[in-house]
Amino acid sequence: MSSSELKALLTAPKSVQQAELERINRFLAGLTAQERVLWGLAYLPGNHALSSSFGIQAAVMLHMVSQVQSDIPVILTDTGYLFPETYQFIDQLTERLSLNLKVYQAPITSAWQEARFGQLWEQGVEGLERYNRLNKVEPMQRALAELEVGTWFAGLRRSQSSTREELPILAIHGSRFKLLPIIEWSNKDVHLYLTQFDLPYHPLWEQGYVSVGDTHSSKPLELGMTEEETRFNGLKRECGLHYEI
């Protein structure tokens, strides 16, 4: 499909969208991750942006996309509770890859939130969901709107959790496309890419973390645990950022 046809697909009936997306995803399945990035930047409409949590394996997508479009906005939602190592990792990769970093935060500071609501992450699933809406979902919605993003690139992978096992390479979320170039990659694929381009893992990887977010809801992988159990005290895997937008 041409760029104009892809743009028109955003407003097509759902049945048409579904049929065309199935066809496009069959095509994309035959491409490498790098080829998917090239295709997406060339054909998918609107402003492009890449979201990143600067997690354990974040350097893969940050490198892969920025090597093709150096000025692509990189959206980070900063909760104010990231690990010190994460902030250092952000600085390291931003400098090394010359990233066009765009940081978005909740309108209310973390200290003010605690004064008003208490520690929401300790208030069960409902508290976690409220915390995530305040600190991740709303800032990301604002970022996508302010940057007028028509195509959203992200580094989700099916092997990361059961909630991601059925995600397609390309989807339509509301009024924009969402492209997941490394969706079927394994941890080995990630390691090979990082090694090939001499890219670092997040510093906490060496301390046993396989997934890292906020200090209060991330912990190292222990014997018998799955990756998704290392986040949010095992209560949930997703913060909502990729599912409520």
UniProtKB/Swiss-Prot annotation:
This is Phosphoadenosine 5'-phosphosulfate reductase. GO terms for biological process: hydrogen sulfide biosynthetic process; sulfate assimilation, phosphoadenylyl sulfate reduction by phosphoadenylyl-sulfate reductase (thioredoxin). InterPro entries: PAPS/APS_Rdtase, PAPS_reduct_dom, PAPS_reductase_CysH, Rossmann-like_a/b/a_fold. Its EC number is 1.8.4.8. HAMAP family: CysH. Keywords: Cytoplasm, Oxidoreductase. Catalyzes the formation of sulfite from phosphoadenosine 5'-phosphosulfate (PAPS) using thioredoxin as an electron donor. It is found in: Cytoplasm. It catalyses: [thioredoxin]-disulfide + sulfite + adenosine 3',5'-bisphosphate + 2 H(+) = [thioredoxin]-dithiol + 3'-phosphoadenylyl sulfate. NCBIfam families: cysH, PAPS_reductase, PRK02090.1. Pathway: Sulfur metabolism; hydrogen sulfide biosynthesis; sulfite from sulfate: step 3/3. GO terms for molecular function: phosphoadenylyl-sulfate reductase (thioredoxin) activity. One of its GO terms (cellular component) is cytoplasm.
